[in-house]
Amino acid sequence: MCRIISIANQKGGVGKTTTAMNVGVALRLTGKRVLLIDLDPQANLSTYLGFTNDEGEPIDDLPTISHLMMVAIGQGKKLTDVKQYIRHNELNDIDYIPSDINLANADCYLAGALSRETVLKRMLTKELISDYDYIIIDCLPSLGVLLMNALVASNGIIIPVQAQKFAFDGLGMLNSIFDQVKATLKPELSLIGVLPTMVDHTNASKRVIEQLKEAYPDELFNTVIHRATEATESTNKHRSLCLYKNRLGEEYKAVAEEIIRREVTA
């Protein structure tokens, strides 16, 4: 059965895109069939995969997630097969649906849509889902209708948290949205785990991890992601950390193994 996982945190700069990309590739390396979905108008995941330039503009005229959402609510030219929106990245051997800056208008064109919180869920057809073991959604740093769509479409959520000062900013509101979706729209939605990122050897980082252990005793990942320059280098080369021999790549592989174990025992 396909598991759909949202990588979400209202706070920006916590490693959502890096986590989505590298967890996805790590799962792929275990033999899982993986689809990445870029649900952020900044399109950082699409840039990581070489689909957009540094300004978030597509390098060609191929359709993106914003086109697909407009089709789903009847505002665009209808394409009969959702799979036409899927791209394959050869370098990382992974499928993805890209984003672009036009997704920034999503709140406007979703405002009048029927069941606007379920548009993404309806886009992920049974035929599409049956092709994958995992679908990973890279969410934007916001609490708007796009995040609601991601959560309603998902089975679970992973929250990356930067192990630095102000790490808990926005977590309360995200937890509130999570509880709201779980109570009213997606009862089976689960918190797969909280992932400390950008961990270093400072006392501040150690304090944040201790606070996370207290706040999420059962959900905190055993693995942490350390701060390292390799993350930026990997993005610039459009190649997952998991394809190099480095500490961060091994950490993301360990996170993927934890996800698989948690899904088995859930």
Question: What role is predicted for each listed range?
Answer:
Residues M1-A266:
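P-loop NTP-binding core
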